[in-house]
């Protein structure tokens, strides 16, 4: 049984670290988190969705003005936390109770790690909402600076999220190890009591690791289906938002063209107003000059004679 539980731990944790390190490289296409626990699959889907938003062009990033993106992230956060809780409860059912003091300590540490991870995911969603507000305030202006700050914040939040996700993995492993040791101690006591009977005939039992693995796979398929549905709906909504942004851009360009034409027409009108006035002033000035010259006895065409 100890060997089976050791194999289970290796199966649960294998590949997790490698995939976490791959996540740091934004350009790599992530796997579908099939080798992980349901809560890790949900977390992976959360970041895959966010990464997909980051890869959009600057023009399309303005789609974040719609609050639907943050609502989809909220749904993924709730799904992740739900699967973490379900996984912890499943561990408790499979391996049985442990010492009350140990269980209280491990549960407290696990809840703290879970809260940190949830806080990191909420910070990501909050930062996107803040960007949406700032972008609305700067509508029609250059948003390169806002997008740069958003990318910088998301990189920092990503590092913190991955760090706390790894910490939660370790806490779950410790919790599982503690419950497994308690179960093994109970099995050892039963083995000592039933030793003579076991000599007469071997006991047959279904390995608990098999049941846990099957349930984990079932959860994975169920959650994967939900998240794929959510992702598909989100992409459809973003496509609609992209079309709306294109329509808005066309309207803005049309209005700008109309304003430009109106300005040109107004300029022409002003010119038609003031041109006769200027011409009239020029005529009056020429007339005044002639009168002054006439009064002084100066002919406009007469040149002063040279003194011999």
UniProtKB/Swiss-Prot annotation:
Region (8 X 22 AA approximate tandem repeats): 75-246
GO CC annotations, alphabetized: chylomicron; extracellular exosome; high-density lipoprotein particle; low-density lipoprotein particle; multivesicular body, internal vesicle; very-low-density lipoprotein particle
Extent of the signal sequence: 1-18
Protein localization: Secreted; Secreted, Extracellular space; Secreted, Extracellular space, Extracellular matrix; Extracellular vesicle
Sequence repeat placement: 75-96, 97-118, 119-140, 141-162, 163-184, 185-206, 207-224, 225-246
Ranges where the record places region Specificity for association with VLDL: 269-281
Function according to Swiss-Prot or TrEMBL: APOE is an apolipoprotein, a protein associating with lipid particles, that mainly functions in lipoprotein-mediated lipid transport between organs via the plasma and interstitial fluids. APOE is a core component of plasma lipoproteins and is involved in their production, conversion and clearance. Apolipoproteins are amphipathic molecules that interact both with lipids of the lipoprotein particle core and the aqueous environment of the plasma.
Region (Homooligomerization): 257-308
SUPFAM superfamilies (alphabetical): Apolipoprotein A-I (SSF58113)
Protein name as it appears in the record: Apolipoprotein E
Principal location class: secreted
């Amino acid at each position: 049984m100890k060997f089976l539980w050791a194999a289970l731990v290796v199966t649960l944790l294998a590949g997790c670290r490698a995939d976490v390190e791959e996540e740091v490289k934004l350009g790599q296409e992530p796997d579908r988190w099939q080798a992980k626990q349901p809560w890790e699959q949900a977390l992976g889907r959360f970041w895959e969705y966010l990464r997909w938003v980051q890869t959009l062009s600057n023009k399309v990033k303005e789609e974040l003005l719609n609050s639907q993106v943050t609502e989809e992230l909220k749904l993924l956060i709730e799904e992740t936390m739900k699967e973490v809780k379900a996984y912890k409860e499943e561990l408790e059912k499979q391996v049985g109770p442990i010492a009350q003091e140990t269980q209280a300590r491990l549960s407290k540490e696990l809840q703290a790690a879970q809260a940190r991870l949830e806080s990191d995911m909420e910070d990501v969603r909050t930062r996107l909402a803040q960007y949406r507000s700032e972008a609305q305030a700067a509508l029609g202006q250059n948003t390169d600076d806002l997008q740069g700050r958003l990318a910088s914040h998301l990189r920092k939040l990503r590092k913190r999220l991955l760090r706390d996700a790894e910490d939660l993995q370790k806490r779950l492993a410790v919790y599982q190890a503690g419950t497994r040791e308690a179960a093994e101690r109970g099995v050892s006591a039963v083995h000592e009591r039933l030793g003579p009977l076991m000599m007469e005939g071997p006991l047959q039992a279904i390995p608990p690791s098999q049941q846990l693995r099957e349930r984990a796979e079932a959860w994975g398929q169920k959650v994967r289906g939900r998240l794929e549905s959510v992702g598909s709906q989100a992409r459809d909504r973003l496509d609609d938002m992209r079309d709306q942004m294109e329509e808005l851009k066309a309207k803005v360009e049309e209005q700008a063209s109309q304003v430009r034409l109106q300005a040109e027409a107004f300029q022409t009108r002003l010119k038609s107003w003031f041109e006769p006035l200027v011409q009239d002033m020029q005529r009056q000035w020429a007339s005044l000059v002639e009168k002054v010259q006439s009064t002084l006895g100066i002919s406009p065409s007469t040149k002063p004679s040279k003194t011999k």
